[in-house]
């Protein structure tokens, strides 16, 4: 990832408009800021949320609250709780998120 020249700025995530994204089941709320090709998000999953697609995009994910299970298409899983992270490169391991109890994440991709 290359971060382009940009002035420093603070982001008050509580003031960033949330967009809703349906899961299978559940709901995700995304608060998104974009800097050229870099997307930075705070994402909240409802309890029982399962992503409705397999994702091949690379991410850096930090769990701020709750718990998620990152399911890989090969059947393996990573279980992460608050304070834990995972990272995956573009087109490496197709994955999707599941949150049995709900979660809040910080994601950069």
Give each language-model segment a name:
Residues 36-55, 89-92:
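Conserved short histidine dyad/triad with adjacent acidic residue
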Residues 45, 54-70:
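Short, conserved beta-strand element in jelly-roll/cupin
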Residues 85-89, 100-109:
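A short hydrophobic beta-strand segment most commonly corresponding to one strand
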Residues 52-53, 70-71, 88-89, 93-100:
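Short beta-strand His + acidic residue motifs that chelate non-heme Fe in jelly-roll/DSBH
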Residues 1-42:
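A short, N-terminal "cap"/entry segment at the start of jelly-roll beta-barrel domains
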């Amino acid at each position: 990832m290359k971060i382009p020249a940009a002035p420093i700025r603070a982001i008050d995530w509580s003031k960033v408009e949330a967009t809703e994204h349906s899961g299978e089941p559940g709901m995700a709320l995304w608060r998104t800021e974009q800097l050229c090709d870099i997307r930075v998000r705070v994402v909240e999953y409802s309890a029982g949320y399962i992503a409705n697609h397999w994702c091949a995009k690379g991410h850096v994910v930090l769990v701020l609250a709750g718990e998620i299970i990152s399911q890989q298409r090969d059947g393996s899983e990573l279980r992460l709780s608050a304070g834990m992270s995972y990272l995956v490169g573009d087109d490496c391991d197709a994955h999707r998120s599941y949150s049995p109890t709900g979660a809040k994440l910080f994601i950069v991709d």
